[in-house]
């Protein structure tokens, strides 16, 4: 372990070289609205190809999968809608109470040892509300589901671990902020500066929270996993699924989250 650590612990794993990108999905091409690569997606003009309000409603097509994933206590209604391979949205009406209510998301399966991956990166574009309590994040699992890596992109809390959403942590400040305490601060990986948090929710969880919030960009997942490995959290893990969505704690009155241009490149 590194002598610069502020606290302590950590650990992600499942086959097949592929490149997931919008250009390679001819089956979906007519179902996807044209969107710019650097701006948030407009509201889809067409009817969805699939929609569900079931708590665990799920849909798979052409190597992608989606799940409504409403799992928290006291959760309200939520509807996920898919318009194409890289375009989907969720309407969610969650009460202003504590605790995550849902994590609607899109996912692809990687299924390779980290050492066998030369490139693992992802692009995202999103349109999010100003209110509520939520964080948009990648959720990356090893194949054994022992280790979970969360990479936040935007959130309603603060980068120091305070605010109305907080990353999982072993340690929280004993003051009114109740802020999660990072194990590393101002880490530069993949062109982004992060605060890093460590905790356990039944799995070993490492969360990277960017100092600057963003609604579009590219994430160097391979670089992040290698950095975590270099700190002794795990060895040559088998990277399982890469998910992207929004952890919703509250969205009173109903709020819309829209996602487009999401793609994962692995080779």
Q: Which ranges hold each PLM region?
A:
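Short, compositionally biased, intrinsically disordered N-terminal export/targeting signals
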Residues: 1-25, 29-37
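Extracellular carbohydrate-recognition regions
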Residues: 39-70, 155-157, 163-168
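Conserved, mostly hydrophobic/aromatic
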Residues: 191
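Long, compositionally biased interface segments
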Residues: 214-267
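Extracellular-facing segments of soluble proteins and assemblies that are Gly/Ser/Thr-biased and enriched
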Residues: 98-182
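Short, surface-exposed, low-complexity cationic segments
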Residues: 197-222
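Short carbohydrate-recognition loop motifs
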Residues: 73-101
């Amino acid at each position: 372990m590194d002598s610069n650590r502020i606290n302590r612990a950590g650990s992600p794993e499942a086959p097949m070289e592929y490149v997931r990108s919008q250009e390679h999905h001819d089956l979906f091409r007519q179902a996807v609205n044209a969107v710019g690569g650097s701006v948030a997606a407009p509201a889809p003009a067409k009817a969805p190809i699939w929609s569900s309000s079931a708590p665990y409603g799920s849909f798979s097509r052409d190597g992608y999968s989606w799940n409504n994933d409403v799992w928290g206590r006291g959760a309200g209604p939520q509807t996920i809608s898919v318009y194409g391979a890289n375009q989907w949205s969720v309407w969610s009406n969650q009460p202003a109470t504590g605790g995550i209510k849902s994590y609607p998301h899109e996912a692809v399966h990687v299924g390779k040892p980290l050492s066998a991956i030369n490139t693992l990166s992802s692009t995202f574009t999103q349109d999010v509300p100003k209110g509520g309590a939520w964080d948009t994040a990648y959720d990356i699992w090893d194949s054994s589901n022992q280790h979970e890596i969360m990479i936040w992109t935007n959130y309603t809390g603060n980068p120091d671990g305070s605010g109305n959403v907080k990353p999982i942590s072993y340690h929280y400040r004993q003051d009114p902020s109740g802020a999660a305490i990072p194990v590393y601060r101002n880490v530069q990986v993949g062109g982004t500066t992060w605060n890093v948090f460590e905790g356990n929710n039944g799995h070993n969880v490492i969360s990277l929270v960017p100092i600057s919030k963003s609604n579009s960009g590219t994430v160097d997942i391979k670089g992040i996993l290698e950095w975590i490995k270099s700190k002794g959290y795990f060895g040559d893990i088998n990277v399982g699924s890469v998910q992207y969505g929004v952890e919703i704690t509250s969205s009173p009155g109903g709020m819309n989250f829209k996602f487009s241009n999401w793609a994962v490149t692995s080779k």
